[in-house]
Design a protein with these regions (language model features):
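C-terminal regulatory/interaction module of P-loop NTP-utilizing enzymes
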Residues: 1-237
Length: 237
């Protein structure tokens, strides 16, 4: 899928790979970095008789870097994947846009850091919300549709070479039927792979039971699960 594309680009161009996995409520500290307060307090306690000890705690040795700062300061050319940016709020998106546009990050009490390599940035979105126009204007848009049945079978087999052909084929076809339903979250290719792996582990002798018992690896909400069981699994299998 989209994540794999970013990894392949990094590998093909011999670049280091960094990833920011966005989610609802993600903060600047989780993207850029944060002060190690415990280490700062320990240093203050150990050096409480020194007059300038407070200034010393605002150095890089007391700062925990997160993916964005690591990608910026990496000496080797890199690829940064900002995965599912639509899950982050607009404030975080604006910050990322500014940092990447200006090629620098400013951290209070620590200073400004310049981009140190030729960084390729890849954003992925599942359209949970519309991205800012400024973000769209600065990106090359690429839509990646779900693969065909035949292609998805090939992908699953490449990930799970030990899986039975019949199991792979059945589950991939079921997933394609599921994607035609109006669901809150349709199963991803990763979900298909996980479902095949789970059914194979549970055993294919009672395929229908294994399929239903492991449905949660591909279907991620209770309402979607009920819909899939009612309209596809119980009706057709």
């Amino acid at each position: 899928g989209k994540t794999q594309l970013a990894k392949v680009i990094a590998s093909a161009f011999d670049r280091d790979f960094f990833r920011i996995q966005c989610y609802e409520g993600i903060t600047f500290e989780q993207i850029v970095g944060e002060w190690n307060y415990q280490k700062q307090l320990l240093h203050l306690e150990a050096a409480k008789n020194e007059s300038d000890n407070e200034e010393k705690i605002f150095h890089e040795e007391f700062f925990i870097r997160r993916p964005l700062l690591n990608a910026f300061l990496n000496e080797k050319d890199s690829v940064l994947l900002i995965d599912e940016i639509d899950k982050a709020d607009e404030e975080v998106e604006s910050f990322l846009l500014q940092a990447l546009g200006e090629k620098e990050i400013t951290i209070n009490d620590l200073g400004t850091f310049q981009l140190a390599n030729d960084l390729i940035v890849i954003l992925t979105s599942n359209s949970q919300r519309s991205l800012l126009d400024e973000t769209k204007d600065r990106c090359l848009f690429l839509y990646i549709p779900y693969p065909s049945v035949e292609r998805e079978i090939e992908i699953v087999k490449s990930r799970l070479p030990g899986a039975e052909d019949e199991t792979v084929s059945k589950i991939v076809k079921i997933v394609h039927e599921i994607r035609n339903l109006n669901l809150m979250k349709k199963p991803s290719v990763r979900g298909t792979v996980d479902w095949v792996r789970s059914v194979s582990s549970l055993g294919t002798k009672n395929f229908n039971k294994s399929l239903e018992d492991s449905i949660g690896v591909a279907i991620k909400t209770e309402s979607d699960k009920k819909r899939v069981l009612k309209d596809i699994i119980h009706k057709k299998y």
